A protein has these predicted regions:
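Residue-level recognition of pore/gate-forming positions within transmembrane alpha-helices
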Residues: 15-18, 53, 57, 86, ...
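Membrane-interface helix-loop junctions in multi-pass transport and translocation proteins
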Residues: 3-7, 66, 70-78, 100-105, ...
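Membrane-embedded alpha-helical segments of multi-pass transporters/permeases
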Residues: 23-26, 61-69, 81, 118-123, ...
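Helix-terminus/linker motif at the lipid-water interface of multi-pass membrane proteins
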Residues: 1-7, 123-127, 185-199
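Membrane-water interface segments that mark the loop-to-transmembrane alpha-helix transition
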Residues: 13, 18-69
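Membrane-interface junctions at transmembrane-helix termini in multi-pass inner-membrane proteins
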Residues: 34-40, 76, 86-110
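Interhelical loop/hinge segments that connect adjacent transmembrane helices in multipass membrane
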Residues: 104-109, 131-133, 137-138, 147-189, ...
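Alpha-helical transmembrane segments of multi-pass membrane proteins
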Residues: 19-23, 66-97, 143-144
Length: 199
């Protein structure tokens, strides 16, 4: 239903957002899973890692909004809508469930999110000028899927507690895991970014 040019624009915008999403998580998906799996105090470990995710996600969101305001090519509705995916990274705690080997909840969540997205797209999108609505459905259900995971997470978590020294010990390993992910991301999405810039 959408033209190749419209889908190309979406691919370009999405490639830009993916860089910020990568920074927002900063290797925490892998590192957090390992730490939760090995921890005897899951709640304390979770909060001391999650605060890093909050900070990096906050930085990513602020810089992203600054860029879409500054760069003419990033103006418009779709880049704004895609920002929702960065808020999704802010509340993404899938690594907690991965660390606890509770993959059932993640699988069910992913299935419901995809089904809701597909049903919404087929129900509400009926014209070529609704690309923004297509993108909205993709990101909003993913965001809601991340948000709802906080409900079952309560059984693992107590009141937030933070230890500056422990937080510092988590920073270097997350950065070290982040760097290879940057290389992979550049390999996967850089072509879309360059096509958008040069096009």
């Amino acid at each position: 239903i959408f033209t190749s040019e419209e889908l190309g624009n979406y691919g370009f915008y999405n490639s830009i957002v993916s860089y910020f999403a990568l920074f927002a998580m900063l290797g925490i998906s892998i590192y957090g899973t390992k730490q939760i799996a090995a921890s005897r105090d899951v709640s304390s470990t979770f909060w001391n890692i999650y605060i890093i995710q909050v900070i990096t996600s906050g930085i990513a969101i602020v810089i992203y909004f600054f860029i879409i305001k500054l760069i003419p090519g990033m103006s418009g509705m779709i880049p704004l809508i895609l920002a929702i995916s960065l808020f999704g990274k802010l509340v993404d705690i899938s690594w907690l469930f991965s660390g606890k080997e509770d993959f059932k909840k993640i699988t069910i969540r992913n299935g419901i999110v995809k089904l809701a997205g597909v049903l919404s797209i087929f129900t509400f999108i009926n014209s070529q000028d609704q690309l923004y609505l297509y993108v909205f459905f993709l990101v909003i259900f993913d965001f809601l899927g991340q948000l709802v995971m906080w409900v079952p997470a309560r059984k693992f978590l107590r009141k937030p507690t933070f230890n500056k020294e422990i937080i510092k010990t988590h920073i270097k390993p997350t950065v070290m895991l982040f760097l290879p992910q940057v290389a992979i991301s550049l390999y996967v999405v850089l072509d879309r970014t360059l096509l958008g810039v040069l096009g």
